[in-house]
């Protein structure tokens, strides 16, 4: 009786040792490559108030100011790499790039605060529990509420640049604010953020 149980145990144990699959290798290699490329890009960006957006036709890196709607993408990428690797160098990079975004917490001229601040700060809060990120997320959400019109029930996307009467401009990018607003409501217990989100 002991021998058949031992054989069964050995067979089951052998099935638990699974070699790395093609998909697992692909993911690991992709993450390794992303780390190399992102570290190189970060080392080339000496001004923490400029953010990479794309390459021009000649292949040169295009940078935008902190007020660009994509300013949170690069810090968000750094947070994601830290979350996957737990490498302290990614934590340092993510904190440094996210710190520059703090000035956006009172920037009232955009609806893109979820892209710009919510994503990287939300990731920083989730991965570190840092109360400074909690405050920044709530302050930014307060600013975003200033764009909400209760008569319309929406957050205005764009301001009217020529000061002429126009329709209330709303685009799907506003959906990127929902997670930040829900989180602000959860953190503060203030239902206003949630009410605007729904």
PLM region spans:
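Bacterial N-terminal signal peptides
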Residues: 7-15, 98
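Bacterial Sec-dependent signal peptides at the C-terminal "C-region" and cleavage site
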Residues: 12-25
